[in-house]
């Protein structure tokens, strides 16, 4: 390929490096628990060789969770997950996108509609009869982990707060989950960053488009991610670091929007991707430069820690694990399990819930066997899945650092 090839062409071109070694199929968490999915190689690179005259995706691709493990383990650099994501989108374009998928792909819209009546909406989500109705009418599994709506968004809290004047500045990309479901995490993130001498700017920001992309709505996903990048790009061009607490949303801006949505030429997205850090990655960099405060109090806790699938796509290792090792008294149990099964909106769907739970069972067993009072994970949907399956409160690593710094818990 010449220098004018698009990233999508490079992704598709990578399939020629596939030697059918089946390493991706061995690592695939979905293929391990259901015979209905033949594995990422068969559904993607292998069948791609026989497709002519346009896309003809295999229907089994609907069971692919999009976790990205196949791309990570491929020894030849084949973009297996990205090829399969493009094929899933083509399949949705041919067959149509169900109403259920259109709804779960827009969590911010649902949250804004529910916010004025959040107590009532949350009571309905907790009612068995209402969840049974959702399952029958929309196909959202009655036991799927659905987070409660926040009565006030994180952005609303930020607007009423007086920022601290500190010598250095960062920008916080909080994502939809923090804004609409976990504003408490956003508040703790700000306080940890400020405790380390950083002024935190929180510009208005929308959805990154990842749920839309995952559900085959690529046109809408492009509009969303371009809008978000336009909001953040002025800060990136001025040299400010942008830190994120959502592993998957950050990966969308760093790589997936370019490789799957074909936005490699978007100047705003390029600028943002070059200045974007996972929050634990950023704090670990501060520590390595001797700039992270280490006035950490003991936290006497046994804490299983699970690194989410999307973190591998960042290529940053496990920075949260290294940060947690700084906390006195904390006994971290590192998970070697690949996936919790939820994969964003995948595991909430009626036909995929049991597959998602089966994928995550080794992780759930590890956490239950640890007898822990809490667990930790960087990704929001993974936290909700782990807490749902085990009954163990599951925290973002920032929440542990917040406690270790002796900062007052948000009301």
What is the role of each PLM region?
Residues 1-7, 30-60, 77-103, 392-401:
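Non-heme iron-sulfur electron-transfer modules
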Residues 12-31, 56-78, 111, 309-310, ...:
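Cysteine-centered iron-sulfur cluster-binding motifs in ferredoxin-type domains/subunits
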Residues 80-411:
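Iron-sulfur cluster-binding electron-transfer modules in prokaryotic oxidoreductases
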Residues 25-27, 35, 181:
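Short N-terminal binding/cap micro-motifs at the start of the first secondary-structure element
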Residues 6-10, 66, 223-224, 359:
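Short, glycine/acidic-rich beta->alpha junctions
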Residues 3-15, 50-61, 193-196, 325-329:
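Short, intrinsically disordered, charge-biased short linear motifs at domain edges
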Residues 7-10, 17, 182, 221:
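Alpha-helix N-cap/helix-initiation motif
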Residues 10-13, 38, 73, 82, ...:
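A general, composition-driven signal for non-globular sequence regions
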């Amino acid at each position: 390929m010449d220098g004018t090839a698009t990233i999508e062409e490079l992704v598709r071109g990578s399939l020629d490096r596939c030697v059918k070694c089946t390493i991706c199929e061995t690592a695939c968490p979905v293929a391990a628990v259901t015979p209905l999915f033949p594995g990422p190689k068969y559904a993607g690179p292998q069948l791609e060789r026989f497709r002519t005259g346009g896309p003809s995706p295999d229907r089994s691709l609907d069971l692919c969770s999009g976790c990205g493990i196949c791309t990570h383990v491929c020894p030849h650099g084949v973009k297996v997950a990205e090829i399969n994501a493009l094929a899933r989108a083509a399949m949705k374009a041919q067959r149509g996108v169900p109403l259920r998928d259109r709804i779960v792909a827009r969590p911010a819209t649902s949250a804004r509609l529910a916010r004025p009546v959040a107590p009532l909406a949350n009571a309905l989500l907790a009612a068995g009869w209402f969840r049974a109705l959702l399952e029958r009418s929309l196909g959202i599994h009655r036991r799927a982990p659905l987070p409660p709506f926040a009565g006030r968004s994180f952005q609303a809290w930020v607007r009423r707060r007086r920022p601290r004047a500190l010598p250095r500045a960062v920008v916080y990309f909080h994502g939809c989950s923090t804004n609409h479901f976990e504003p408490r995490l956003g508040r703790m993130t700000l306080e940890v960053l400020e405790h380390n001498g950083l002024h935190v700017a929180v510009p208005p920001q929308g959805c990154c488009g990842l749920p839309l992309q995952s559900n085959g709505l690529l046109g809408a996903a492009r509009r969303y991610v371009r809008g978000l990048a336009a909001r953040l790009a002025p800060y990136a061009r001025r040299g400010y670091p942008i830190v994120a607490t959502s592993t998957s949303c950050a990966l969308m801006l760093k790589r997936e929007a370019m490789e799957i949505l074909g936005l490699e030429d978007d100047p705003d997205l390029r600028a943002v991707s070059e200045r974007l850090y996972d929050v634990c990655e950023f704090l670990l960099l501060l520590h390595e430069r001797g700039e992270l405060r280490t006035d950490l109090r003991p936290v006497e806790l046994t804490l299983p820690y699970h690194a989410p699938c999307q973190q591998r796509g960042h290529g940053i290792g496990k920075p949260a694990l290294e940060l947690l090792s700084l906390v006195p008294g904390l006994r971290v149990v590192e998970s070697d399990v690949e996936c919790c099964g939820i994969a964003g909106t995948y595991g909430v769907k009626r036909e995929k819930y049991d597959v998602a739970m089966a994928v995550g069972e080794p992780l759930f067993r590890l956490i239950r066997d640890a007898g822990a009072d809490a667990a930790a994970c960087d990704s929001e949907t993974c936290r909700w899945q782990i807490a749902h399956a085990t009954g163990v409160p599951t925290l973002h690593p920032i929440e542990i650092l917040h406690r270790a710094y002796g900062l007052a818990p948000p009301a």
